[in-house]
Amino acid sequence: MIHPREVLEGPILAVSRQTKSVVDIPGAPKRYSFAKVSAPIEVPGLLDLQLDSFAWLIGTPEWRARQQEEFGEGARITSGLENILEELSPIQDYSGNMSLSLSEPRFEPVKNTIDEAKEKDINYAAPLYVTAEFVNNTTGEIKSQTVFIGDFPMMTDKGTFIINGTERVVVSQLVRSPGVYFDQTIDKSTERPLHAVKVIPSRGAWLEFDVDKRDSVGVRIDRKRRQPVTVLLKALGWTTEQITERFGFSEIMMSTLESDGVANTDEALLEIYRKQRPGEQPTRDLAQSLLDNSFFKAKRYDLAKVGRYKINRKLGLGGDNDGLMTLTEEDIATAIEYLVRLHAGERVMTSPTGEEIPVETDDIDHFGNRRLRTVGELIQNQVRVGLSRMERVVRERMTTQDAESITPTSLINVRPVSAAIREFFGTSQLSQFMDQNNSLSGLTHKRRLSALGPGGLSRERAGIEVRDVHPSHYGRMCPIETPEGPNIGLIGSLASYARVNPFGFIETPYRRVIDGKLTDQIDYLTADEEDRFVVAQANTHYDEDGVITDESVTVRLKDGDIAMVSRTDVDYMDVSPRQMVSVGTAMIPFLEHDDANRALMGANMQKQAVPLVRAEAPFVGTGMELRAAYDAGDLVITPKAGVVENVTADIVTIMDDEGKRDTYVLRKFQRTNQGTSYNQKPLVNQGDRVEAGQVIADGPGTFNGEMSLGRNLLVAFMPWEGHNYEDAIILNQNIVEQDILTSIHIEEHEIDARDTKLGAEEITRDIPNVSEEVLKDLDERGIVRIGADVRDGDILVGKVTPKGETELTPEERLLRAIFGEKAREVRDTSMKVPHGETGKVIGVRRFSREDDDDLAPGVNEMIRVYVAQKRKIQDGDKLAGRHGNKGVVGKILPQEDMPFLPDGTPVDIILNTHGVPRRMNIGQVLETHLGWLAAAGWSVDPEDPKNAELIKTLPKELYDVPAGSLTATPVFDGASNEELAGLLANSRPNRDGDVMVNADGKATLIDGRSGEPYPYPVSIGYMYMLKLHHLVDEKIHARSTGPYSMITQQPLGGKAQFGGQRFGEMEVWAMQAYGAAYTLQELLTIKSDDVVGRVKVYEAIVKGENIPDPGIPESFKVLLKELQSLCLNVEVLSADGTPMELAGDDDDFDQAGASLGINLSRDERSDADTA
């Protein structure tokens, strides 16, 4: 076996480093855990995927120190940027007399802080410089200069980039690895297996060999026409004797050799050239250089380190040619030999190095054949594109400029490089607007793996196989967390313990087992390596010495097969039961009892939870909450121990043990990308002692340093008067009044004052035709004051724009002369609160050219207003649990009408029982039981005979748990049904000495309206409920008048366009079914697009007359025009058969409108933006 470490030279990607263990986090809240398996290692740093990859790209000092430590002092270590500069250098002119080399990339300090970059809409970037050395080979002259390449976006410590003021994430891409792939297809006519092999480089032409149904071996170069494979071998200089000597064992190769029709190398080269470049006149030299450039020249062909590693492993070529990034004749010959042996049905072959290698086809969906392009490599590829564009410019300038006066700076044009970087961050499919809905959504976004994007798959072409869960995903990519919809299976999430190796393959850790005994050795294995071992699961029983106690053990073999083997045959064991799932999925308690489809929804909906005004940690957790919040980067963590000196709402000052004062500024009520509120709250008090690594302030959606996205609510499973039919939810009014599910949402409104052709726009309080009442909240500049309560239509910023000058009347000229400029024509273009929005102004930012702010060309002033809205839970809002159990609030009942327990406690929420059985997410019921136990507490007497079975599995620290405790039931290693049943029988009584919930988890509930008990006991307990981002306030919409489409003259559609409701085909059928002909005619004409009719109706209503008859709808006229455009002569005939002219009513329309002084047919251009 070739170990990945042995073939490493040049680009070295960092391996994930161990981060702080959960048990080491000082001040962490106490959770009572039901875990039976203790993991030998902690979860690696959850952001290492991003941070380490970027550290490799720019070569940070910390990264270099880690590499020196791992590979020894003498090892040659190059960063990603150094690699591409080495690849590119030297750039020579066409004659070879001059060359330019680039080296030593280095960064100056970042220009702006992260907050400044966000505020000013600029990039968080550092200037990049390289050393450029120009050599004139004829004179021997060397000129060296430092060249500025451009501002290079830098990653923040949270793994994000700030581009144009917004936070973005670069998602890692899953692509097929370069290498050699053998494939089998069945011929439809003969039903015989046909075999093919593809040699796929990182960059360059594909080389494909295949055996067709006539048993001839062919080759395709760069997807061009097929030709006999012996033609290629002869073109490489092989004689017939050499071919016979190497492939004489194969009849199909010999028959191909006899029928190839070329006698020698020259003929073979010309034949290849004709196939590759049909229509061009071939010469031997041209043909030879075409073949050399295609596969044997590093400029045109690059296998990359990973491609060379994969080819050597597959074909058993040893490690002698590790540094070679092009193909060799031996690669080609061995690939052909492997193919013909595979076709002959052989199972093993001897490689050129004498190694016995298996002969088998490859599974392209196997994670041994798919690798990750992480952020560093994606940016590196983009810089390479920019530098290759720059290289062309440098070559041209070398030939055109005077050799004596050339300097490196005169040759280099850095525009292509900075443009390529800007294009990648701004427009690439893999550079995404960060999901900041809550802490978990940001964390999982950074750990996302996408098979889409440039060089990847497209969602239209991707089949079922590539989307499906594969055995090699185990411990590498989560089988649960993926989007629903067209991207299912193409976008995944990194498993919790996984890391990326230097080649981009995902590795997962296993614990070494030798002769049935566990060792402390942890090996990270790729999917390829894992296939050769026998792996037991994490919950395999072993004694205190680590010896496996079961004689036969359930294990996983190659291709995911499950078998029972002797304990001495086990090679490895999983490190943790949650090894196969992602961070988001690992936060679903009792995941093992949920159907995978519902678990997928649960994992995805946690990312949609909005942070609440008051967070609350879940009674039932999984133990992952602390670590997820800690690594997400939204908590404030002190790096040094000390004493808290001062605490306010937004500043914490700590005097550390060295006598140095550290000040931490908290972020208060800032807007996130999704419009939720980002707010940090201090957790420490003045005089507290804090340790290094302690959480001193909570972020959004965290509580005491734990991820806390929802609230614990007392839930009853029962139907209630049909109000919770079809997943509707009934809530207690108390939840609204106590602000239990209240969230804060912040909207940003922006307006700028520009120079127009008619003069400059002005931000002012002096707005024409507006009463003082409307201006009451504006300051003297015309900007709304902070703290003002605003609702839709209120002015936030007053602005006037010059109107077009018209011919002035004598009276206006007189006014102009008396009052000066004041009487000039301006129109009100103030920024108003959009339709349907209300809130309180919490911030105003003003940027002005006078203050030297960097504004876009033509903009003199820009104002941003932040409006915060407190949204209480209401009918129509969406709530969900963590098990995919989602629903919409259907009714909010007064507290006195809710069912209540015998001690008078009303339930918070009523869920329908029908939501459980067919969805098979039983985890929600178990969570409810354990939630009740955590809230009530329990006490187990180990001496009591009824607890004999319970104490066999229950950890000793769980015998006595107080009320209101937090519990952890890790996925696949949590509380069992028997434990829950046993604990329910031992739950603590309430203060009156009564036990409310029986041993079966049910209670007698009393109807709040009648005071009568319900006839059957009801399942009751605490469930953790999330309020999702799908809020009814953002969806509800109504329109009276508004913009029309210019073509059809019908109202626009959708809330964003302030559109109307579509009365569609099916609605028309309903009207027809009821025979409501006149109502239907009205809907399709005067209420929609009968332009003349709708004005006349308005006129009739104003004048108190009868409604006139409808005319012809505009959409009918459009239909006629479309038919005429297809050269069909369409006429409208009257009842007596005479042709009618449709376009004659406009005069009536104009007169009616003019007489009323209105124009109802406003088009979308003028109105859609103001609506």
Swiss-Prot record:
Reactions accelerated catalytically: RNA(n) + a ribonucleoside 5'-triphosphate = RNA(n+1) + diphosphate
Record carries keyword Transmembrane: no
GO biological process: DNA-templated transcription
Superkingdom classification of source: Bacteria
Enzyme Commission number(s) from the entry: 2.7.7.6
Keywords: DNA-directed RNA polymerase, Nucleotidyltransferase, Transcription, Transferase
Gene3D superfamilies: 2.40.50.100, 2.40.50.150, 3.90.1100.10, DNA-directed RNA polymerase, beta subunit, external 1 domain, DNA-directed RNA polymerase, subunit 2, domain 6, RNA polymerase alpha subunit dimerisation domain, RNA polymerase Rpb2, domain 2
GO molecular function: DNA binding; DNA-directed RNA polymerase activity; ribonucleoside binding
GO cellular component: DNA-directed RNA polymerase complex
Similarity section: Belongs to the RNA polymerase beta chain family.
Function: DNA-dependent RNA polymerase catalyzes the transcription of DNA into RNA using the four ribonucleoside triphosphates as substrates.
Assembly information from the UniProt record: The RNAP catalytic core consists of 2 alpha, 1 beta, 1 beta' and 1 omega subunit. When a sigma factor is associated with the core the holoenzyme is formed, which can initiate transcription.
Protein name: DNA-directed RNA polymerase subunit beta
Gene source species: Corynebacterium efficiens (strain DSM 44549 / YS-314 / AJ 12310 / JCM 11189 / NBRC 100395)
